[in-house]
Regions:
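Transmembrane helical segments that form the transport core of multi-pass membrane transport proteins
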Residues: 16, 198-265
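C-terminal ends of transmembrane helices
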Residues: 9-23, 95-104, 126-136, 188-198, ...
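Transmembrane helix-loop junctions at the membrane interface of multipass transporters and ion channels
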Residues: 45-55, 147-170, 288-295
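Membrane-water interface at loop-to-transmembrane-helix junctions
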Residues: 24-35, 71-85, 199-226
Length: 320
């Protein structure tokens, strides 16, 4: 066995050297630190739902206000084990793509960078390529990159739903695949208009940086509380409002939230529509970023393609 391991290491020695050169040590340490913290902390976190009324001091402070206290008590969304598990899941999903982006590098062209970047952060790809499109003679590669990354986001959302609540996949797969299909086909057509490729570097923060993970965790908790609050106040409409608002900032948190809530009482149709609304909201934000941060001609092409993707996806959702 040892001989096989040694032989295998020698066979990939050159690739390991290349890997070491492209991955910075602080990124390695960040990943190790994150993994250790998760392994050590996760098993000890309580896997039960709490509300802030379970904090004795807060419970006493709200005791004179029974109606408000009763409402707050219904916001029992604080499950520390599941919250941190979601952070680990999203960070891990992003980190795989992040490592591939670092290994491949921008010298392989905007196509691969945008494809993998869409799995890390399609918004980051949009911001970076939009800013770099200004003053460029050829804008087609930038349209291609933004549309490609945005289309991959639809697939990423489907993966997240499949992992958290696969019962929703059957209702989401056709609309999301339709959106992705229109975007990917459009990106392919755009790439054939002019053959010029650009090798622009797209910057991402390591998903395993502890600060980045904690920020996502806090935002996820905020979206959980917001969604449950609006649901209690306005019913299904509250979920839709939360989805639209959350999608403006980050699609992952609301996708995880609605997928989780659908396991504990939220109607699947409401969760599905909420996820579609969040995806639409997030896509419209990327169109806005392209317009205000990038070349206007480039942004108009991005707008046409992505809006068409949304229209097709929504139409499919209404038919199924």
């Amino acid at each position: 066995i040892i001989a096989v391991i040694v032989a295998s290491l020698l066979a990939v020695k050159e690739h390991l050297h290349k890997f070491a050169k492209k991955i910075q040590m602080n990124e390695v340490f960040a990943a190790i630190k994150f993994a250790l913290i998760s392994i050590i902390i996760l098993p000890f976190l309580p896997n039960e739902n709490y509300s802030i009324l379970d904090v004795n001091v807060i419970s006493k402070l709200l005791a004179p206000f029974p109606s408000f206290s009763s409402f707050i008590g219904q916001l029992d969304v604080f499950n520390l084990f599941k919250i941190w598990l979601m952070v680990v899941f999203i960070s891990g999903l992003s980190f795989v793509a992040y490592i591939l982006v670092r290994l491949i590098g921008s010298e392989k062209g905007i196509g691969l960078t945008s494809f993998l970047g869409g799995m890390v952060s399609s918004t980051a790809v949009t911001v970076s390529l939009s800013e770099k499109s200004k003053g460029k003679k050829f804008i087609t590669p930038f349209v291609f990159g933004i549309v490609l990354a945005s289309s991959i986001m639809f697939i990423r959302v489907l993966i997240e739903v499949a992992v958290i609540n696969n019962s929703l996949v059957s209702k989401l797969i056709l609309p999301l695949i339709a959106m992705a299909f229109v975007g990917l086909i459009s990106a392919f057509i755009v790439s054939k208009i002019k053959k010029q490729d650009v090798k622009e570097k797209v910057s991402f923060k390591s998903p395993f940086a502890l600060g980045h993970a904690l920020k996502f965790g806090l935002f996820f908790v905020f979206i959980l509380v917001l969604s449950k609050t609006l649901f209690l106040l306005f019913g299904d409409k509250g979920i839709y409002i939360a989805a639209l608002v959350a999608g403006l900032a980050d699609v992952d948190a609301i996708v995880l939230t609605l997928s989780s809530l659908a396991l504990t009482g939220l109607e699947p149709r409401v969760a599905v529509l909420g996820i579609i609304l969040a995806v639409c909201s997030n896509t419209l934000v990327k169109i806005g970023i392209a317009y205000f941060s990038g070349d206007k001609k480039m942004a108009k092409r991005v707008l046409i393609i992505l809006v068409l993707s949304l229209i097709v996806g929504i139409s499919v959702a209404l038919l199924v």
